[in-house]
Amino acid sequence: MLDNVLRIATRQSPLALWQAHYVKDKLMASHPGLVVELVPMVTRGDVILDTPLAKVGGKGLFVKELEVALLENRADIAVHSMKDVPVEFPQGLGLVTICEREDPRDAFVSNNYDNLDALPAGSIVGTSSLRRQCQLAERRPDLIIRSLRGNVGTRLSKLDNGEYDAIILAVAGLKRLGLESRIRAALPPEISLPAVGQGAVGIECRLDDTRTRELLAALNHHETALRVTAERAMNTRLEGGCQVPIGSYAELIDGEIWLRALVGAPDGSQIIRGERRGAPQDAEQMGISLAEELLNNGAREILAEVYNGDAPA
C-alpha cells in the first residue's frame, strides 16, 4: 500500500456512503496530500431484508464483511454508525476513533400526524428496533407496531405508500441525507431513549496499524467518545445486541456525565430504568455499575426471556 493512500471499507447504502465521505473529507482536510479511496461492499444485513434483524443475528450483520476486509488488508479503516457496532471485535481489530455526534434522538415521521400522541388508536407504526418498540408500546399500548426494514429511502417509500401511519427513524440519518423536512417531531429521551452510540460515527482499524491510527487521531471527538464509552460499557455488561430492547444515553453537563439507561420487555409490559451521574474519567465504570443495577432490578429476567437462554451472569 502506498504511504499516501488510505482505503475505507463501507457499505453501499446512501447513509453509509455519506458517513464514508464525511470521514474521507475530514481526513483529507486534516492531512493535505493524503489520498483516500472508498472500497464499497455489500453486507448480509443489506441483503436479508425480509426478516426482523433480531431473528437473523442482529446488527453485527452490517459490519462483519467490513471487518474481514480489514483483516485481509483489502482496506485500512471501516466506518460504522456507532449504534450498529457490536460490543466485541475480532482479534486484532478495534474501535479507535469516534467522531463528533449528530443529534442522537429518534424521529417521528408521518404524513398525517404531528406527533406520537396525535396518532389515533389502532394506527400502524413501523420500526425495526425492539428498543423503539418497547418504549412505544409502553406509552401507546393502543398502537399496532409492525416491523420495518430497508434503508431510509425504502422505509420512507413504505410510509408514503400507505403501509404505515407513522414510522420511527433516527434524526441523525435523516439530517445527513438532507431529509430533515420529513421529521414531524424529534422524540425527547424521556419518550424514546436512544440506542447506544446513536448519532455517532465510529472508525475501526487494525490495532497494530500505527500509521493509520495516527492519521485518525485528528478526527476523534473527546466529548462524544466519553459519552459513547459510558453507553457502550453498560451495553457490554448487559451483553446487549440489537436483539434486545436496550436504550442508553449519556450527556456531558457542567463537566459531569449523566447516563440514563433502560432494558424492556419487547411488548412494553415491563421497562427497567436507571441513571448515574459522575466524573468523565469514571465513564466506563459508571456504565458497568448502572448495568449491574438494572440486572439486579429485573433486567436479568427480561434478557433471559428475550434470549431464550442464559441471562448475563
Swiss-Prot record:
Gene Ontology BP annotations: protoporphyrinogen IX biosynthetic process
Modified residues (S-(dipyrrolylmethanemethyl)cysteine): C242
Domain of life: Bacteria
Alphabetized UniProt keyword annotations: Porphyrin biosynthesis, Transferase
Cofactor comment: Binds 1 dipyrromethane group covalently.
InterPro entries, per database record: HemC, Porphobilin_deaminase_cofac_BS, Porphobilin_deaminase_N, Porphobilinogen_deaminase_C, Porphobilinogen_deaminase_C_sf
Gene3D superfamilies xref list: Periplasmic binding protein-like II, Porphobilinogen deaminase, C-terminal domain
Note: The porphobilinogen subunits are added to the dipyrromethane group.
Subunit structure: Monomer.
NCBIfam families: hemC
Name this protein carries in UniProt: Porphobilinogen deaminase
Gene: hemC
